[in-house]
């Protein structure tokens, strides 16, 4: 079978905050898929970057008395440290504030402009007279023009849900200076999205999106596509629009181009062919993993920009839902707005990887991290089932058989049943239905433990050491099959299991033959149980984080 060439991206985390468990849902989802593709022998690259531009970055650095470059450098280092400990295996993690991104953004802009897809017009915006800067909607607060609710942002009311322009807000104030904004005219640059309506509809019909996403896009088409403002006025931290003084690319223009820039950096470092992956007639595969809150940008603007600049479009966009904790939106006051670092200070990252896999499917439903179920699921499935197979079998092999597996002929049909299940597990991984894959694997783990229970090696050892040798050797081989299937989800535990089994990296193809007359190493615990105390410590530490921020 010919190896596939695949490029995978995840949404870029913004460089003004820390990674939290909501972010990690997507990176773990994508990482599992990438690891699976590599196990299948496919050439698969996974790129990402910090999203570094925009008014919030400029203002935050100003508040801290440092340059934006210094701010984003420190944030990137922390982001990458968190990702590394959660085993997110990026081929390249870059920054949107890079020469590659600047060059590609300018190139795309010139192509769009030359083709007549960039328009200009004068617009009126809210302007802070004290800070001498135009204000994004989220930097203005006031009273809702419809229901009168206080302290509402400049784009929509969180109380009654109405949307409006900042100029309609009553008693409006700049959240930067507390000054009353004034209206000021400015020339802005627009991407003419409506020109691509026919092409976008055709692209969507080709099946690049989940059905739920396609249905949502149909609603937007019915409302009518609008030209997209791709410019912002100085002062602004970002890339200046070529040949236009005092105008910068809006962050949402150069952010998705950051996917291309990150891959370009990887290509330059490893001698890969960038054009092979992004030329209009490319035969490679391109997949974006994103959350449902940024579908509009990725399923309309982004493909249209690629079409207009003569690049290939995504093979598919994989959309996931939001993360809730204990059935509710993450809350700082309840201690359920959990940062990655807070989790890492108390719990094993592989536990979260498994729980997310147990919950994730190809649908865009929200995922709930129920902390009680999280503890019970990890303790039951990983510790009580999978690891238990190895731990309860190894002692006999160490004490009686010099840690060497038998050349057994006992119950070969059970081993082959485990191997045959690999086909359906592969299909579930490929389709991103990890929840179904985990359930299949745990059914097998139950069978392995049932097999040990039925043969009772602790009793057999008194009268039939040969059968004990065969039973425990088969159990170890069943454990090997399960860990091969779990490797995309649990890479660290899989590595430890490889060392215990004294083998090279787990490989689906190697499962055709069981290990016989093979010496293993001393067993060391692969996973510890989650205790209530640890979860309580995470919640309490998250509450403390809120107080520090406040």
Swiss-Prot record:
GO cellular component, as recorded: cytosol
Pfam families in UniProt: Anticodon_3 (PF19303), tRNA-synt_1g (PF09334)
SUPFAM superfamilies (UniProt xref): Anticodon-binding domain of a subclass of class I aminoacyl-tRNA synthetases (SSF47323), Methionyl-tRNA synthetase (MetRS), Zn-domain (SSF57770), Nucleotidylyl transferase (SSF52374)
Native species: Ruthia magnifica subsp. Calyptogena magnifica
GO molecular function: ATP binding; metal ion binding; methionine-tRNA ligase activity
Role of this protein: Is required not only for elongation of protein synthesis but also for the initiation of all mRNA translation through initiator tRNA(fMet) aminoacylation.
Lineage, top ranks: Bacteria, Pseudomonadati, Pseudomonadota, Gammaproteobacteria, Candidatus Pseudothioglobaceae
Protein name: Methionine--tRNA ligase
InterPro entries, per the entry: aa-tRNA-synth_I_CS, Anticodon_Met, Met-tRNA_ligase_1, Met-tRNA_synth, Methionyl/Leucyl_tRNA_Synth, MetRS_core, MetRS_Zn, Rossmann-like_a/b/a_fold
Hydrolase recorded as keyword: no
Family (UniProt): Belongs to the class-I aminoacyl-tRNA synthetase family. MetG type 1 subfamily.
Subcellular location per the Swiss-Prot or TrEMBL entry: Cytoplasm
EC number: 6.1.1.10
Motif stretch ('KMSKS' region): 329-333
Catalysed reaction equations from the record: tRNA(Met) + L-methionine + ATP = L-methionyl-tRNA(Met) + AMP + diphosphate
Top-level taxon of the source organism: Bacteria
Cofactor: Zn(2+)
Motif position, 'HIGH' region: 13-23
Residues where Zn(2+) binds: 144, 147, 157, 160
Claim: Aminoacyl-tRNA synthetase is one of the keywords in the record: yes
Keywords, comma-separated and alphabetical: Aminoacyl-tRNA synthetase, ATP-binding, Cytoplasm, Ligase, Metal-binding, Nucleotide-binding, Protein biosynthesis, Zinc
Top enzyme category: ligase
UniProt-listed GO biological process terms: methionyl-tRNA aminoacylation
